[in-house]
């Protein structure tokens, strides 16, 4: 998995070197070396961008895809849904955390100098702008375009009498029985409103005395949001073939409110939705049983305080004041939306069987290293010949990483499988393989991170299933999330023991592996096998190893390891020039890492960052970041891999860690060095494609604004399409 108007400023030519010069050849890479460290200027206080506003900018880039007429129509609807889901989670976690700090009087400023209260105010203003734009893209662009393709999302007023009669029957039989109108009066307190539920706020009037009363009707979340009409309107023969019409469920309920309140006059009704704090706090050091502690906290999460109130823009002031008072919501937390609330429901429309309105189907290929071998031990034989780098979704996950684990479970010579699981799919073949391994008498160890946000219930369920099958289940280290993506297979080969490993950037999830871009290293290298053995001993036992042979491991080693390599790249650049650092990641926030990149820029090292989401680094500022260039690539696949390259010291690293405080200080993360020249060449090609001047992307300017690139009139290539074509070519 996931924020604004394109009112952006072009970067001044004086502050940005010629892009073709910087990109094209080795001889042009790296500015002239700074003479000495003394030549570096002090770093200014305003060198960081706000991480929360940067995240909103990321979601605005997602919204820009929904507004892109060149994309297939249902893909645009999908991006509208993704935007909405992203924003929900942002409020449940990030905004909730800021509000908690503000309410507790913890006015610790952000790296860019803002108090929690100031950040909340800016977030509210920014969210209102992009939420309005989100609604307008749907109302003014996507919805009419869907109608042109025969997919109509209609209102009750659009229906003819036959359609209304049809829906009357449907409502009476399917919807009315599950509705519970909740009145508010001295005998009925204001009802609890669950987070992310869609509701109707209804004002009714008694016909006898004219007294008005409030009632709340929850739109059921266990039925489709959009009700499909069974038959199209009458018309010429063939005219309506392929036409479908949908009515939002809240419109259907609103039309039949008199049935819910017989004898009452319906004065007004409006849709609303609240978001609640879902940021859990589990006191691990005080709870012996982490599983029970987490389950208690999950039960409490649904009752978290409100952090956002979304309302339809037709809501009256009186109704809004009532909701603010009864829900205890601050006026600054209200987001007013034209049209429909909760467009995450557009996934239902995306799921329509209309392939012409979606991206062409893409079937991942089996990696060439595994394509021609069919014996049960084929992957082990391949890895004995050399390391393999897989790039998902272009290389199939199921015929590489998944098969590696499945073959290990079935191989009688395999003695042990040790695996980390952060987020896995509902019918996970990885989990099944671990269960089969345990049932076959192998030592199977699963480190299940039950604190993976919003996957806690699923992970608890799988942890118990694994335990019942005899798998040794561990929940990680107290106070840390285990986010690394590692698997260790121990195999007897003759009189020797050999270890086979996988270290990746993405989760062991066969479903998301078709949608997320990730890389992974499969290897039988003894030093990596020894490192993973030490790592799993740390995770399952009382070992506290902090240094490794060929890995960087957080929370002790990644930040210092990266900064130390930046300093080595600077030193090498001073000796011979050609300094270049390339980073690809989901987020760049950690101030110490950012400062090290500023120092590299001041020394003349070229720094290129490809970041999907948050970036707190301010590029292109003369004196400290003029040699830093930041771009963001979004597309049909979620760019998820983390890769770092230091040119002069000739090191490539891949792994699970983004450059964020939580990854470097509060998680177990792993970066592995890729050494095989054939594999580093693959990573180099990936960087060259992502950084090509003609690649469609957004570029970050020194003012914090993101600008679409290339500009109109220039050649444009799609990074992901290019990779799909490359993987399919013979």
Curated annotation (Swiss-Prot):
<dbReference type="GO" id="GO:0008976">
    <property type="term" value="F:polyphosphate kinase activity"/>
</dbReference>
<feature type="binding site">
    <location>
        <position position="612"/>
    </location>
    <ligand>
        <name>ATP</name>
    </ligand>
</feature>
<dbReference type="InterPro" id="IPR025198">
    <property type="entry name" value="PPK_N_dom"/>
</dbReference>
<dbReference type="InterPro" id="IPR036832">
    <property type="entry name" value="PPK_N_dom_sf"/>
</dbReference>
<keyword id="KW-0547">Nucleotide-binding</keyword>
<keyword id="KW-0597">Phosphoprotein</keyword>
<feature type="binding site">
    <location>
        <position position="453"/>
    </location>
    <ligand>
        <name>Mg(2+)</name>
    </ligand>
</feature>
<dbReference type="InterPro" id="IPR024953">
    <property type="entry name" value="PP_kinase_middle"/>
</dbReference>
<dbReference type="Pfam" id="PF13089">
    <property type="entry name" value="PP_kinase_N"/>
</dbReference>
<dbReference type="GO" id="GO:0009358">
    <property type="term" value="C:polyphosphate kinase complex"/>
</dbReference>
<comment type="similarity">
    <text>Belongs to the polyphosphate kinase 1 (PPK1) family.</text>
</comment>
<feature type="active site" description="Phosphohistidine intermediate">
    <location>
        <position position="483"/>
    </location>
</feature>
<keyword id="KW-0418">Kinase</keyword>
<dbReference type="InterPro" id="IPR003414">
    <property type="entry name" value="PP_kinase"/>
</dbReference>
<keyword id="KW-0808">Transferase</keyword>
<dbReference type="Pfam" id="PF02503">
    <property type="entry name" value="PP_kinase"/>
</dbReference>
<comment type="function">
    <text>Catalyzes the reversible transfer of the terminal phosphate of ATP to form a long-chain polyphosphate (polyP).</text>
</comment>
<keyword id="KW-0479">Metal-binding</keyword>
<dbReference type="GO" id="GO:0005524">
    <property type="term" value="F:ATP binding"/>
</dbReference>
<feature type="binding site">
    <location>
        <position position="86"/>
    </location>
    <ligand>
        <name>ATP</name>
    </ligand>
</feature>
<feature type="compositionally biased region" description="Basic and acidic residues">
    <location>
        <begin position="1"/>
        <end position="21"/>
    </location>
</feature>
<protein>
    <recommendedName>
        <fullName>Polyphosphate kinase</fullName>
        <ecNumber>2.7.4.1</ecNumber>
    </recommendedName>
</protein>
<dbReference type="InterPro" id="IPR025200">
    <property type="entry name" value="PPK_C_dom2"/>
</dbReference>
<dbReference type="GO" id="GO:0046872">
    <property type="term" value="F:metal ion binding"/>
</dbReference>
<feature type="binding site">
    <location>
        <position position="423"/>
    </location>
    <ligand>
        <name>Mg(2+)</name>
    </ligand>
</feature>
<keyword id="KW-0067">ATP-binding</keyword>
<dbReference type="InterPro" id="IPR041108">
    <property type="entry name" value="PP_kinase_C_1"/>
</dbReference>
<keyword id="KW-0460">Magnesium</keyword>
<feature type="binding site">
    <location>
        <position position="516"/>
    </location>
    <ligand>
        <name>ATP</name>
    </ligand>
</feature>
<dbReference type="Pfam" id="PF13090">
    <property type="entry name" value="PP_kinase_C"/>
</dbReference>
<feature type="region of interest" description="Disordered">
    <location>
        <begin position="1"/>
        <end position="39"/>
    </location>
</feature>
<dbReference type="Pfam" id="PF17941">
    <property type="entry name" value="PP_kinase_C_1"/>
</dbReference>
<dbReference type="InterPro" id="IPR036830">
    <property type="entry name" value="PP_kinase_middle_dom_sf"/>
</dbReference>
<feature type="binding site">
    <location>
        <position position="640"/>
    </location>
    <ligand>
        <name>ATP</name>
    </ligand>
</feature>
<dbReference type="GO" id="GO:0006799">
    <property type="term" value="P:polyphosphate biosynthetic process"/>
</dbReference>
